[in-house]
Amino acid sequence: MSNIYNIEILQIIDSVAREKGISKEILISTVEQAVQVAGRKKYGNEYNIKAQINRKTGEINLLRILKIVEDVEDYLTQISLEDALVKNPEAKIGDEIYEYLPPIDHARVSAQAAKQVITQRVIEAEREKQYHDFKDRKGDIINGIVKRIEYGDIIVDLSRAEAIIKKDQLIKGEHFKPNDRIKAYVQDVRQETKGPQIFLSRVDNQMLVKLFKLEVPEILEDIIQIKSVARDPGSKAKIAVFASDSSIDPVGSCVGIRGNRVKAVTNELNGEKIDIVLWSNDLAQFIVNSLIPLAPSEITKILIDEDSHKVEVVVSQEHQSIAIGRRGQNVRLASKLTGWNIDIMTEEQESKRRNEEFSTSTELFMEALDVEEVIGQLLSVTGFNSVEQIASSEISTLTRIEGFEEELAVEIKNRAIHYVDLKNEKIIKKLEELGVEQELIDILELPLELILKFAEYGIKTIEDLGEMSVNEFKNLAPNSNITDENIKLLIKTARHHGELKDS
């Protein structure tokens, strides 16, 4: 039997469902749960109680659920088949029997349910809806209105939700005030207890990529590809582009007529100057292109060291400052763009460095291999700069050196191997004395000299490695050819290993 309170509940539910865009069924189920709680408080928690609301009349009924069993152990929640057949001739073991319970004060309970539970469920449902609306927007550019500023963080009104731009995700020097329009990149969407958290950024590299996609149709259509990006947000950026169709000028397409396309991106990013660089699978050419505004003709020489993942670019004295850029910005961005550590040197500096390296390696070979100066010089001028390189080289490589017959080549190689073995034995002994775990040596896969350096710094176990930062790792192994991503993976693996040990 329905009454005015029951009808009022349905009206409240209808109104909230329409206004908030929440399923009517979800709200009714929520009220039913509240009534069930009230029923258990009155009749006892030991009862299995269910509330039902008639979707048309709003009538509320309380029912006790009894499970049909062969042997009744709990008379509050179970019923025998014999007793169940009296109530329902078609009853069988495993079914449930519903018994109506005397009504409680539905008017009071209904009002409380409408006021408290619906409100809470609306909040939860809105949070769920916001999360589902925005979780697929991760990686998009989004527009909003600055709602307020809290300790430097910007709270952005997205109409159906709020987002946050942390202070460190804002471009340095830009200022926003309430009601300003703002465009940002959706960096992450997380479901948390207090609701969905939408994190925006204006400094993420992908912000630049997405803006170019908006301005350059050829990028959106994948005719032009963005290969890599490097940014000093708000100051300068470099973006490497490529088109497989040789008839298309990817750089010109991104710049636009009279620079209109790149200017649009620059204006959005608080005046960030952008160099459009032509990508090439020829590393030397890509390095040359990346150093714009330095002209290719102003580069004298490029020396690529694959072992240390370094590139030396030799220029004249007058062009060095252009190549390096203000406070090293140009070469730093070029290094990030290409993924190689680029060092700019003048012709004089390069000549001096080569002479110093030649002298150093010659002296090393004379002492380590017990050879005359002329042999040390021949090894140095051939390109060897460590005893390890000689030890691992082929005899045929050594015999190509002028004056090196096979007998001499074999002797030099054997002396190099002996030197390296003795050196490694000393390092291994030192590592043992320091208590370095073999697992750490295995996972690092670095020369023993570097591992000793790690150990002397205090990194002796995989757990120690897991507590390192990428910068710490790079400072200890500056000349290793391990990329930042692989360093992160090493540290992550070490942390996971430590967690498994603790569990």
Swiss-Prot record:
Function: Participates in both transcription termination and antitermination.
This protein's GO CC annotations: cytosol
GO biological process: DNA-templated transcription termination; transcription antitermination
Domain KH: 308-378
Keyword Cytoplasm recorded: yes
GO molecular function, one term: nucleotide binding
Gene: nusA
Species, as recorded: Rickettsia prowazekii (strain Madrid E)
HAMAP family referenced in this protein's UniProt entry, alphabetically: NusA_B
Keywords: Cytoplasm, RNA-binding, Transcription, Transcription antitermination, Transcription regulation, Transcription termination
Principal localisation: cytoplasm
Official protein name in the record: Transcription termination/antitermination protein NusA
